[in-house]
Every structure is written in C-alpha cells, then in structure tokens.
Amino acid sequence: MGLTYQMKMKIPFDMADMNGHIKLPDVILLSLQVSGMQSIELGVSDKAILEEHNLVWIITDYDIEVVRLPRFAEEITIETEALSYNRLFCYRRFTIYDEAGQELIHMMATFVLMDRDSRKVHAVEPEIVAPYQSDFDKKLIRGPKYESLDEPVSKDYHVRFYDLDMNGHVNNSKYLDWIFEVMGAEFLTHYIPKKINLKYVKEVRPGGVITSAVERTGLESKHEITSDGATNAQAIITWQEIKKD
C-alpha cells in the first residue's frame, strides 16, 4: 500500500445535473485533480514527468462502485492512494466520503505510462513511482470480459476541439458523457450507476465522429464507443433507482 492523500471540496452548481447530483464525469475530473496534487507535492508532477522523460500518464480501466452520488453544495472528501504497480500497470484507489465519513463512491483506476511522441506504452520507471511508496506486485488486476453488442441502439457524436486534452486525445471523462447520453434523459432522470467497468481500447482521433452504442437488459447495460471502424472504449454498467429524499 502507498501514501494516501486527501482533499475536501464542495460540489459547485455547474457540476450538478438535473437531479441535483454531481455528474459522474466530474467525479473523475475532481479525483484526477486530487491525484495530480499528490504527485506535485511528491515531486513527480505530470509536467516534470513530461519534461524529464517525455512520458504521460494515461488510464486504461476504471472500476467504479457508487453507493450514492454527492449533491450540489455537499462537502465531500476525496482520498486517493497509489496501491501497487508492475512492469506496465499502476493501480490507484479513489474513495469519496461524505461529511460523516460514509463512503459514497469507490473507484479503482489502472494507469500506464505512454511516450508522448511514439504514443506507445512505456515500462514503469522506478524513479517515477518510488515517491508514492506503493508495492511492486506482479499480479495483474483484470476487468470483466467485454462482449460485442448484437442489437444495439446507437447515436453519433462529433469530437470537438475542447474534448481533447493537452496529450491530444479525448479526455477520459468525455467517454462517460457519450456513454450516459445514449441512455436518454427519461432513464437518467430515474437511475444512476451502481457499478461501472470501463475499458479504454484505442484513442479517438481529433475532429472525427464517434458512435456510442448500448444494449440494455433490465438494470444492466453494455456499451461500445467506436470510430473509423475500430473500438475505442467498452463499458458494462449496473444501474440503481434514485432514492427519493
């Protein structure tokens, strides 16, 4: 286990949806801000890694469990910990607590290092991960098996300039926007995710069009994001009905 790091914050108005809950893509953005602050304090910021090694962190998988979503103006604590790493993968935990210390969201993220020029995965550099004091463990954490969709409902979206980050690829949280949007407003008004497994397969090209496809059976949905004939991301979501206050 590695060093833990925490930050408190209140959910701002622009991060709340029609139900008054924080949008899950914003949960990811806030969580990555917290891990970024930890990296800065440990002397291994994204800027330093890029300048010294020409490497950037990318995320390949998320495993997210939701008890409930924080609401507008609610104060939360986001805690993160770099758990372990092996030759290629680094595993990080994010946990979101309410003011009473109750766990609201638990998220596991799998990171890899990528060479910014070649766009190829790079082996973990020991000096980059050493400050986090996480364990070296050869064991791979594997997600579920993602199957192709047989009869999906789909919708196309244009990839906009501001969907891209400074690495030149679509921001991680944007994929969740596309995944949720295809579910429709009526469904999203009554249901929130209970568990999400999300796998990033291939970068989306700037300026193109993606197709977000879904197959839903009861409270489980299977998702696929494709562009130019290739699969970019896959997800499996279990949903839960929104509890009335």
Tell me the role of every PLM-derived stretch.
Residues M1-E79, L83-D245:
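Terminal targeting signals and extreme-terminal segments of soluble enzymes
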